[in-house]
UniProtKB/Swiss-Prot annotation:
DNA-dependent RNA polymerase (RNAP) catalyzes the transcription of DNA into RNA using the four ribonucleoside triphosphates as substrates. Forms part of the jaw domain. PANTHER family: DNA-DIRECTED RNA POLYMERASE, DNA-DIRECTED RNA POLYMERASE III SUBUNIT RPC1. It is found in: Cytoplasm. Part of the RNA polymerase complex. GO terms for molecular function: DNA binding; DNA-directed RNA polymerase activity. It catalyses: RNA(n) + a ribonucleoside 5'-triphosphate = RNA(n+1) + diphosphate. Belongs to the RNA polymerase beta' chain family. This is DNA-directed RNA polymerase subunit Rpo1C. Keywords: Cytoplasm, DNA-binding, DNA-directed RNA polymerase, Nucleotidyltransferase, Transcription, Transferase. It comes from Thermococcus celer. GO terms for biological process: DNA-templated transcription. The keyword Acyltransferase does not apply. Its EC number is 2.7.7.6. InterPro entries: DNA-dir_RpoC_beta_prime, RNA_pol_Rpb1_5, RPO1C.
Amino acid sequence: MVAAKTIKGMVDKAELPDNIKEELYAKLIEYNKKYKLKKAEVQAIIDETVKEYQKALIEPGEAIGTVAAQSIGEPSTQMTLNTFHYAGVAEINVTLGLPRIIEIVDARKNPSTPIMTVYLDEEHRYDREKALEVARRIEGTSLENLARETTIDILNFEFIVEIDPERLEKAGLDMERIQRKLESSFKSAEFEVDGYTVIMRPKKVGKISSLRRLAEKVKKHRLKGLSRVGKTVITKDSKTGEYIIRTEGSNFKQVLKVPGVDPTRTRTNDIREIAEVLGIEAARNAIIDEILKTMEEQGLEVDVRHIMLVADMMTLDGVIRPIGRHGIVGEKASVLARAAFEITTQHLFEAAERGAVDPLNGVVENVLIGQPVPVGTGTVKLAMNLPLRPKRE
């Protein structure tokens, strides 16, 4: 059996990154206790690890961008183009497949189906009633959500809302609270509550169109919950037995402050919101996770390193940039590369007007003018010392 100190010294000498060294050391200690390894066996394991690590490295001059584009693009052609219901929950729609991939790499400001996955703290996660309490705090509820029927009375210049008692109870509200909330928000109208009926009368009698506009505002007015968040759905995780809340709509900054929510695990599928709240590194991880998850849902396998390269390029400058003419490709230094991508004539005219010079450092511009591309063997230039002829006397 080899001493732990000896194993540590042997691992430290190996040409490996620190994180792999740590993992290798832990494994060797574990196997050493179990199988009582000899020094030669420990060295053989280290040598094999170094060999495998070197095999995994990219060759200098490899066209990694092209390989990543092919590796992500080819499986993407097999994806479906639909919006599906979320994990068997019919109430919430989620964008999957190719539209979701496009949405991520385009760095859209408003995703088509923003969703938050809200995890709960120790006190709330295993009790459905307590999970329901947290869901009520999150779920955005407006008068429209509670209404059974709405009517505009033109003769009396009134807007009448019939409230559904069941929905009212489910939302954890009462009629007095609704009246107080509306009165504090709309000073230009009077509100009367009669049983489960809310009657709104504008203080000034004007045009019917102004009553309609005011009625629309009152209907949409948020009575409780977070802004930009619609309904919530509680599901139970079959593996852990804990309750998880999924929301239609996203307000990541505010949901982290809600009592009962576990802020360390709660997440949203809105990448820009993650960057705003948690920073660019978290957004980079979210891009990788979202693309991987979308691929896996379709049963497609892509090496994570291709996706990491895309995420690195998108977040390189500390802000999220789309891949396309409004982002990375559109900001390329080469005029010819930009012209080869989209809106060719405009790029060429603008470059001619400025008297721009193309250094021809990239792949696209060299292909365009028929030169060898600076990839692989094209990245190196040979320098030779030729034998000099002796001078004639």
